[in-house]
């Protein structure tokens, strides 16, 4: 009788935050293959649908031992941050197979500049942008 009574009395109402996922946004073009070609640098973005306020942004930089990278690999994990009220941007950078250092660092900085320049479009508070990463991305 006690469990039945509690089930009737306790009602849990939770609303999932709604967010958008946009992939493949070109934020810059850069020389690739050591100056022999041009490459579009892209980012993936997870941002709340609610456009009534600005949100802090977390820029995610994936790892890959400097020789490979997949900016979309962790979007499922990063969506947890979006549920907590962050805009999350996963940025692409050139690897050591494509360009010499400091090219990867310049690419990440270009991504952050793009996010600041388009802060209104994605509901980003340009004064609250943080960076995190793993492996090579953590160094950048």
Go through each PLM region and give its residues.
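Short beta-to-alpha linker loops that shape the active-site pocket of alpha/beta-hydrolase fold enzymes
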Residues: 64, 87, 92-96
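Alpha/beta-hydrolase active-site loop
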Residues: 99-120
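Gly/Ser-rich "nucleophile elbow"/oxyanion-hole loop immediately N-terminal to the catalytic nucleophile
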Residues: 53, 116-135
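Short amphipathic alpha-helix adjacent to the substrate-entry channel of hydrolases
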Residues: 72-90
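Short beta-strand element of the alpha/beta-hydrolase
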Residues: 54-64
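N-terminal cap/lid segment of alpha/beta-hydrolase-fold proteins
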Residues: 2-53
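Short N-terminal helix/helix-N-cap motif within the alpha/beta-hydrolase-1
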Residues: 68-72, 98-99
């Amino acid at each position: 009788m006690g469990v039945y009574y509690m089930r009737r009395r306790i009602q849990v109402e939770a609303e999932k935050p709604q967010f958008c996922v946009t992939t493949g946004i070109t934020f810059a073009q850069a020389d690739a293959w050591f100056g022999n070609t041009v490459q579009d640098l892209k980012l993936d973005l997870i941002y709340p649908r609610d456009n009534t306020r600005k949100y802090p942004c977390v820029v995610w930089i994936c790892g890959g031992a400097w020789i490979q990278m997949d900016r979309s690999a962790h979007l499922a994990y990063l969506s947890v941050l979006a549920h907590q009220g962050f805009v999350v941007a996963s940025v692409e950078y050139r690897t050591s197979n494509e360009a010499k250092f400091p090219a990867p660092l310049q690419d990440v900085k270009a991504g952050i500049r793009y996010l600041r320049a388009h802060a209104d479009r994605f509901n980003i508070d340009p004064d609250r942008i943080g960076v995190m990463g793993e492996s090579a991305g953590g160094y950048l």
